[in-house]
Structures are given as C-alpha cells and as structure tokens.
From Swiss-Prot:
Pathway of action: Glycolipid biosynthesis; lipid IV(A) biosynthesis; lipid IV(A) from (3R)-3-hydroxytetradecanoyl-[acyl-carrier-protein] and UDP-N-acetyl-alpha-D-glucosamine: step 2/6
Organism the protein comes from: Cyanidium caldarium (Red alga)
The protein's name in its UniProt record: UDP-3-O-acyl-N-acetylglucosamine deacetylase
Compartments, record wording: Plastid, Chloroplast
UniProt similarity note: Belongs to the LpxC family.
Classification of source organism: Eukaryota, Rhodophyta, Bangiophyceae, Cyanidiales, Cyanidiaceae
Length: 282
C-alpha cells in the first residue's frame, strides 16, 4: 500500500444543492501520512480548525453527509467528492472550502475525478494506513432499508433499489467486485448522477431545501418517465447508490475490505454502518 497526493492545486466553483449558495473549493497537495482534511476559510467569526472525515464529526445524514463541529462550522454534501478521492486512492490532501457546501456540479463524481486526475496523482511513500477488515457478518436495517456485511478479501458492493411506481427505474441491482482496483467500473460509478422524484423535489424546494437543484445537477422523474433523460448508462440510479456508499465509507479510512449487500440504501443507514464498523474496530 502507498500514500498518494497530487502534484499541484486545483480549484473549482459551483452551486450548492441544498443551500443554492456558490462555493469555491481548492484542493492542495499534502505531505505523506497527514491524511485528508477540510478547512472553512470563509467564516471570519471562527478560528480555522481542520474538519477531518470521521464518524466523530458527522452532524447530519438525513439527506446528505454533513461534517463539522456545529451547524455554523460544518461542510455539507461531502460524499461525491469523497467518493472521487476514494476511487483515486488519494490519502493526503488539504481541501479549502469557501462556502457552506461542496458544489453539486453535475450531480455525480466525474468532474471531481477528472479534476483530481488533472492535478496529477502520484505516490509519495509507503503507507502506514490501517486496512479495515470485517471478520464477522452482521445486518443493519431501518424500515425497508438494509445492509448486510460479510468478510471479504477486498471491497465489493451489491446494491439494489426499487421504485415500483416509476417505470423508468423499477427494480435495479448491481454488483461490483474489487471496487478500488476495478478500473473498468471506475468511470461508470463516478459518472452516475443523483436522482429523485420531480414532484417531491419541488415540495422540498418550497420548504427551503434543495435551493440549488435543477435539471442539470440531478436526474428527475415524473409520472414514471425521466424529465431530463437519457441516462448515461443502464442502472445509473443504482450505480449512484454505490457512489454515495463509497463516499460515506471513506469516513472509515482509506482501505476497506468487506462485501456489502445493500437495499434502498441512504446516507442515514450508511452512517449507521460506518459507526458500527468503528465500534468493531475498538
């Protein structure tokens, strides 16, 4: 195992999905063994304190994963960027955020992935990162959502979704083995966009949520059909669930080895899974 960082900084700006506020994010190289951390530089009333991707700093996982110390010093929507970081196997980065939320961009991780590749990823040293292995089988369920974890020799995910009232989606299952070394699947996962019911999104917008949502940064369906198709590939919605799960699993650490079977997964149950893994690690 090795440590990886980037050769030069990269910057991008964009709108936040939930707040609608424009944010700028700059990603810098970092020294070996330092890890990944975020800094909010736009808050003049607070000292600049690193926010480290960790289960201890999860403030909210209802609609997305929010990290921070309190609501005023937090970072919203980390999962798409963290998924790109994991798929790139990066271990050491300093990430400066000017704004409350990481930009949604096109609703997937592909722009993040390409941005990191443009920054030229390289090996800095041998890694001392802990490889997290699950030695037991366990089951987590919330209503009709569940995740089962099995011991495995690498990271593998089998996930399913079920939208019986939407003919465009219906039931989808996808299995991806050896996730972090399966280069064939990497672009497909990273390109998968977030999605939702057009009518429900409009209701949430009127309630003050999803202020940055539009038909460019999210797939929307209505009356069983896509409002802004076509899909980039078959099972794009199911693959986006894999993308989100990879991003949330990055809170465990760099290298994870287990086989997950998930059904109707969301950020809340993903957070429960990560917290359970952390308890096993003690």
């Amino acid at each position: 195992m090795y440590n990886y960082t980037i050769y030069h900084p990269v910057k991008i700006s964009g709108r936040g999905l939930y707040t609608g506020i424009n944010s700028t994010i700059t990603i810098y190289p970092e020294l070996p063994h330092v890890g990944i951390y975020f800094l909010r530089t736009d808050l003049t009333d607070y000292p600049i304190v690193p926010i480290i991707p960790s289960t201890l700093l999860v403030l909210n996982s209802k609609l997305s994963t929010v990290l921070g110390f309190h609501d005023d010093y937090s970072i919203m929507l980390i999962e798409h960027l963290m998924s790109a970081i994991s798929l790139s196997q990066l271990t050491d980065l300093k990430i400066i955020l000017e704004g409350p939320e990481i930009p949604i961009l096109d609703g997937s991780s592909i722009i993040w992935l390409k941005l990191l590749q443009q920054a030229k990823i390289y090996i800095t040293s041998l890694s001392n990162c802990i490889i997290f292995k699950s030695s037991c089988t366990f089951f987590i369920q919330t209503k009709d959502t569940f995740i089962i974890s099995f011991p495995y020799t690498s990271l593998a995910i089998n996930t399913g979704i079920d939208f019986k009232n939407c003919l465009a989606i219906k039931s989808q299952w996808i299995t991806i083995l050896d996730l972090l070394i399966n280069r064939f699947e990497l672009v497909g996962i990273a390109s998968s966009r977030t999605f939702g019911d057009f009518n429900q999104i409009n209701i949430l917008i009127n309630e003050g949520f999803f202020q940055g949502a539009n038909l460019y940064n999210a797939l929307a369906f209505q009356l069983g059909n896509w409002c802004n198709g076509p899909l980039r590939f078959i099972c794009e919605p199911a693959k986006h669930k894999v993308l989100d799960l990879i991003g949330d699993l990055r809170l465990l650490g760099v290298y994870n080895m287990f086989f997950l079977i998930g059904y109707k997964t969301n950020h809340f149950v993903n957070s429960q899974l990560v917290q359970f893994f952390k308890k096993l690690d003690k």
